[in-house]
Amino acid sequence: VEKEELYALDITGAKWRKSSRSLLICVEMAEIAGGAMALRDSKNPEIGDLRFTAEEWSAFRDGVRAGEFG
């Protein structure tokens, strides 16, 4: 899925998940089409989500694993 197509996707049936280690503050994530990911605030899901292509998500995940964000 291309970046410009992500926000046109209907994700009302997405299966959102969050860390089992979280308390009250948490980010939820859902895999959408083609390995793309959507993230939202679990306390305020009505404000919307951020969407990332599979390539963007992979680069972010690799950066976290490599310690690039502190």
Where would I find each of the regions flagged by the language model?
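Positively charged, low-complexity terminal tracts
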Residues: 1-70
